[in-house]
C-alpha cells in the first residue's frame, strides 16, 4: 500500500499538486507497524484508514499529501494486482522449470514401455515418454492460461470515487502506472 501511495504522491509532485520533495520525505519517515495498524483498525473498522493513520503518526504534517483524491479501492485493488502479478510471475518461472524437466524426462523415457490407461483400466502399451509428453502439452496450455490471467489482472486503477477522476487528474494514474508495471484499465470502475 505504501508504494502505491508514494507513486501517486510522486505523480502529484510532478504535476505540482503537492510540494516537491514530499514523497521522498514520506518514504524516509514512513515505517510500517503492523501491530499499530491492527490496533487502529480495531477502532476504525477500516483497513486503509488504519494504514494511513499509522503512517501519519510517523510522518507528521506531510502525511496530509497522501491519498489525495483517491479511494480505498484505488489503493487496495492496485496493490492486490501488483501482488497477483508478482506471484503469477513466480509461478511462470516454476512452470518453465517443470517444462524443462518434463522435456528431459520425455527424451529419457521415449523407449520405456508402460501400460496405457483408458477409463481407469489397462489399455494399449505406450511409452512412458509419450505419457509425459501429454503432461508437457498440458503444462504448456496452463502456461498460456496463466499468461492470459496475468494480462487480465495487470491493471492500475487510481481514478478516485467510483472511477470519475472528480478529485484526481487522470495524468496521476498514467504517471503512477509506470512505476507499478501494470497497465491502465480500458474503462474505469463504476
Question: What are these language model-derived features?
Answer:
Residues 188-190:
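Acidic, Ala/Val/Gly-enriched low-complexity intrinsically disordered segments
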Residues 1-165, 169-177:
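A helix-coil-helix interface module used to build multimeric assemblies
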Residues 180-186:
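Conserved small/polar residues in nucleotide/adenosyl-binding loops
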Amino acid at each position: 500500500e505504501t508504494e502505491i501511495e508514494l507513486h501517486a504522491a510522486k505523480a502529484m509532485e510532478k504535476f505540482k499538486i503537492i510540494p516537491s520533495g514530499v514523497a521522498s520525505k514520506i518514504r524516509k519517515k514512513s515505517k510500517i507497524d503492523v501491530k499499530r495498524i491492527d490496533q487502529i483498525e480495531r477502532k476504525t473498522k477500516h483497513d486503509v484508514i488504519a494504514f494511513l493513520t499509522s503512517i501519519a503518526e510517523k510522518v507528521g504534517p506531510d502525511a496530509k499529501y497522501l491519498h489525495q483524491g483517491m479511494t480505498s479501492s484505488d489503493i487496495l485493488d492496485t496493490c492486490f494486482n501488483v501482488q497477483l502479478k508478482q506471484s503469477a510471475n513466480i509461478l511462470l518461472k516454476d512452470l518453465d522449470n517443470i517444462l524443462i524437466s518434463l522435456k528431459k524426462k520425455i527424451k529419457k523415457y521415449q523407449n520405456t514401455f508402460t501400460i496405457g490407461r483408458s477409463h481407469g483400466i489397462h489399455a494399449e502399451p505406450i511409452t512412458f515418454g509419450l505419457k509425459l509428453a501429454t503432461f508437457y502439452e498440458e503444462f504448456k496450455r496452463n502456461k498460456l492460461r496463466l499468461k492470459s490471467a496475468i494480462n487480465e489482472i495487470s491493471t492500475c486503477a487510481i481514478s478516485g470515487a467510483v472511477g470519475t477522476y472528480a478529485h484526481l487528474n487522470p495524468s496521476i494514474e498514467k504517471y503512477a502506472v509506470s512505476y507499478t508495471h501494470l497497465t491502465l484499465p480500458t474503462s474505469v470502475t463504476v
